[in-house]
């Protein structure tokens, strides 16, 4: 896991630690000192800690004009013990929502497990974003993780989508593709 870096090909467009509106503004990173772990496995030092002991993230892009953010996740999403959705909502998503972001693309291909609890925070997040015309999409969640996510019926609140070649898109084009697909599903 220490070799899995956050996607960095958009860093010429956006760097979360340099964005004064980002929850991660001012953070500094080491390229050589591995200190964060998911269980006993070290992860690359570029990932951001947001309060969970098993799930980390990197904000790849926040576009305040178009009102969307792309966030990559790594680790285990554990609502049963860690209440990760509460931490993610309170410590990251709400801070972006306060800045006007209403649409979130969560890249979940490195979320290896999911353990559910109740759906309260998912429902709350869905309601808050829907009121503003927003949404949350989990992109490329592994099938075993999707199984547990769907079993808890959380896909009512967070859309699950597949787009294997998302890295080939520019951020705005990725957003427009996903936004267009969601709009088409609703009509």
Residue ranges and their predicted role:
Residues 2-50, 60-64, 69-73, 77-110, ...:
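Amphipathic, Lys/Arg-enriched alpha-helical "gate/interface" segment within cytosolic domains
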